[in-house]
From Swiss-Prot:
Disulfide bond annotation, renumbered to this chain: none
This protein's record includes keyword Protease: no
Keywords: Coiled coil
Name of the protein this chain belongs to: Coiled-coil domain-containing protein 175
Coiled coil: 131-163, 205-377, 431-535, 562-679, 716-745
Originating gene: CCDC175
Keyword Coiled coil: yes
Length: 793
């Protein structure tokens, strides 16, 4: 009776077993979920990202490093999402297997159901909580990464715009700098042409000066030769004049003695005439005395003729000396005129040289101004270079910051690699592929890091070279400025000296002109004096000629009267009457003799005056000669001083020319440096143009990749939203599953309590028998598989 109510329970148990067998279907259907879990778009995005990664790994593709890193980060994030998706699928499969195990245990092991169900429920709850927490953490991480990516995108857009503006500014500055350089080079070319022209002109002027110096030297040599000849002639003429003066003095002494003798004879003649008058009686003696007197008269007539001849010779010599003196004066005047003409020519050449020197000085001033302008332009270019260098340093600091950011990203990548290693332990099938990809990426990163290190080393070397070059250029510019200042000081000193010398030369020229005027006046006075003396000499010569003619007439008369005297002597006795006539004649002759004596006295007095005048003229001539010699010496001293001044000026001109040569050599050195700088600038221009072209190409590629990236990001955002919806659905289903598990646990607890009651009611032997004959079947509530539908949406 007690067992009767249990029979329907057995039937109910069979029904429950059948229901339980039917309920195993949904749990098995969980294992047949699709591999994509409803994210086909993510697979397409992964394929596109793999293509992008391959293109990034290729050496042909060139893009900004930040864009590369950004794309790599996106690829890694998408890979992580795909791995998370696969991990969730694996976990769901594991949970389905565990549920199948639980169903199997519930079916096969009714005795140990409590422990296993409790452990299963605990494990399931723990796993569910852990999975929920991990999913939440991953969702927050993905959201944070998405926000970071958006911030990076905005920063990159801003940085790209700033770089575009900077590039435009740099292009404008570069164009301005190129224009300024072209202008400076044109100015330098014009200055070099002008310098070459001035150098050629200076060389021509130098050659002209050398020719003039040669002409001056030749003229000086001729002057010295003519001076020597003039001195020799002068010495010869002075010797001849001294000889003639000596002979003249000897003859003068002889004439003076003869005059004395004539006076004595005249006294004797007077005495004889007195004796003749007194001793008229003694005719024989008188005749003898008359004969003696005639002989003495003849003797004295011969001496007088000789004296006349000597006087004629002396007059001829005086004429010769006067002619030679006039010739010598003419020659000296011609030589003086030649020297004056040469001095005038030299003064004209000096004036022309001064004018040329002034022109050259003005040209030097213009060149100095142009040089200062070029220096100011070079300073401006140097300041522009410094600005460009500062901008480069700013860019380098920005690059260093980016490198630091890259190092941080590398650390993040290493952490991600560690996470990948942990994931590779779970997925052994994809381990080799990901390791190869990671090796390739690490190799590329090492290459890029090595390239970055090499480029940094090159940049440091170039900076050092640039710093050394700038230091050298500054030192050279300072040395040049010091040299230019010294040259300007020296030039100012030379200009002062030249002005002082010019003043001295002008003073010397004025003195020379004064001396020339004085010499001309003295020469005119001397010529006038000579003319007056010549006139006086001509007058005295005419008087002397008249007196000689009178003496000749008287001698002829005496010759005529001699035969008459002989006749008178012969007829003295016969013609005594004629004595009175003769006495009258003698008295007349006495008167004539007195007149002759008076004339002789006057002649002697005039001759003495003439001699005194000649001595005065000689003294004046000596004084004039001394004055001329002094003046010539002064002229020679002035000429020597002028020659010394010319020599000093020539030396100064040579020094200036040497300084000009040095300046030209330094200008050539500067030109070479400028050409080197220009070549370096052209190389920089080419490199900058190449870099600008590369930047333009990279910008185009970057824009294309950026558009693709934006499309992919949009797709990924859409896919992420879908995945989030899927994850939310999964969490809802997991919650429903937990609730169902709780219901199952409550039902199991109720069944366990029922079993306990049954155990308490029945004996253990009955239970063993029942266990042998009866297999209990548990009926679980049928749960429809809605997860498949929700997951496959």
């Amino acid at each position: 009776m007690a067992l009767s109510p249990w029979t329907p329970g057995l039937g109910a148990g069979e029904k429950l077993v059948q229901a339980a067998a039917v309920s195993t279907g949904p749990s098995l259907e969980l294992c047949t979920l699709p591999s994509t879990l409803g994210s086909s778009v993510a697979v397409e995005a992964l394929e596109q990202l793999f293509v992008v990664e391959q293109s990034l790994q290729s050496d042909y593709f060139k893009c900004n490093e930040e864009a590369k890193i950004f794309l790599k980060d996106i690829a890694v994030a998408v890979k992580k999402l795909e791995e998370m998706r696969k991990a969730t699928i694996d976990l769901l499969e594991i949970e389905s297997m565990e549920l199948n195990k639980l169903y199997y245990l519930l079916e096969t092991l009714p005795n140990s159901i409590k422990r296993e169900l409790e452990e299963c429920v605990r494990d399931a709850r723990r796993l569910n909580l852990f999975e929920i927490n991990t999913i939440k953490m991953r969702i927050t991480r993905t959201e944070n990464e998405i926000e970071l990516l958006k911030k990076k995108i905005t920063d990159l857009t801003k940085y790209n715009e700033a770089l575009g503006e900077k590039q435009e500014e740099l292009a404008r500055k570069h164009a301005r700098f190129v224009l300024s350089l072209n202008q400076t080079m044109e100015k330098k070319a014009t200055t070099t042409v002008y310098i070459n022209e001035t150098y050629t002109k200076i060389n021509l002027k130098r050659e002209d000066i050398a020719l003039q110096k040669k002409c001056i030297q030749e003229a000086e040599e001729l002057m010295e030769k003519e001076r020597a000849e003039y001195l020799i002639r002068k010495q010869e003429l002075t010797a001849q004049i001294n000889e003639f003066e000596n002979t003249r003095e000897v003859k003068r002494m002889e004439t003076y003695q003869k005059k004395k003798e004539l006076d004595k004879l005249q006294t004797k003649m007077s005495k004889i005439k007195e004796t003749v008058t007194v001793s008229a009686a003694v005719l024989s003696d008188h005749n003898l005395e008359i004969a003696r007197l005639h002989e003495s008269i003849r003797y004295w007539e011969q001496e007088v003729s000789e004296l006349k001849k000597d006087l004629a010779i002396l007059e001829a010599k005086l004429c010769f000396f006067t002619d030679n003196k006039e010739k010598l004066d003419d020659i000296s005047n011609d030589e003086k005129n030649e020297f004056l003409n040469k001095i005038k020519q030299l003064v004209e050449t000096l004036h022309a040289a001064r004018m040329e020197y002034k022109d050259l000085r003005e040209k030097m001033k213009t060149l100095a101004r142009q040089y200062k302008i070029v220096l100011s332009e070079e300073e401006k270019a140097f300041l522009q270079k410094q600005k460009i260098h500062d901008e480069n340093q700013k860019q380098l600091t920005f690059i260093s910051q980016k490198e630091y950011f890259l190092s941080q990203k590398r650390v993040d990548i290493k952490n991600m690699e560690e996470g990948l290693i942990t994931l590779q332990e779970l997925q052994q099938a994809t381990k080799t592929v990901y390791q190869q990809q990671i090796k390739i990426l690490s190799a590329n990163l090492e290459r890029e890091s090595q390239r970055c290190v090499i480029t940094q080393w090159k940049m440091a070397c170039l900076r050092k070279k640039h710093a050394r070059w700038t230091a050298k250029i500054k030192a050279e510019i300072q040395a040049i400025t010091e040299k230019i200042q010294n040259a300007e000081v020296r030039r100012i000193e030379l200009l002062n000296e030249t002005s002082f010398r010019q003043q001295e030369i002008s003073g010397f020229v004025a003195q020379i002109e004064k001396l020339t005027t004085e010499l001309k006046e003295e020469e005119k006075a001397f010529v006038n004096k000579e003319k007056m003396l010549m006139k006086e000499l001509s007058k005295y010569e005419e008087i002397f000629v008249k007196e000689t003619q009178i003496n000749k007439e008287k001698e002829e008369e005496l010759v005529e009267y001699l035969p008459q005297l002989q006749v008178a002597e012969q007829e003295y006795k016969e013609k005594r009457r004629k004595l009175e006539e003769l006495s009258n004649i003698i008295t007349a002759q006495r008167q004539e003799e007195d007149l002759l004596n008076n004339h002789i006295f006057l002649f002697t007095r005039d001759f003495s005056r003439y001699i005194s005048n000649m001595e005065d003229v000689k003294q004046e001539l000596q004084q004039l000669r001394d004055q001329e010699s002094k003046k010539n010496k002064d002229h020679f001293e002035t000429l020597k001083n002028l020659e010394n001044g010319f020599y000093i000026n020539d030396q100064k001109a040579d020094l200036l020319l040497l300084e000009n040569k040095k300046l030209k050599e330094y200008i050539l050195y500067l030109k070479n440096n400028i050409e080197k700088y220009r070549e370096g600038q052209e190389a920089l221009m080419h490199t900058s143009s190449d870099l600008s072209r590369q930047l333009i190409a990279q910008e185009a590629q970057y824009k294309d990749l950026w558009a693709e990236f934006q499309t992919t990001v949009k797709i990924l955002v859409d896919n992420g939203e879908e995945t989030l919806q899927d994850i939310n659905n999964l969490t809802d289903k997991l919650r429903e599953r937990d609730e169902k598990m709780q219901h199952v646990s409550t039902w199991l607890r109720g069944s366990l309590e029922g079993l306990r009651l049954l155990v308490e009611q029945e004996s253990p032997m009955d239970l063993l028998k029942k266990k042998k004959h009866i297999r209990t079947r548990v009926h679980f509530p049928v749960v429809k598989c809605t997860e498949k539908n929700t997951l496959t949406k």
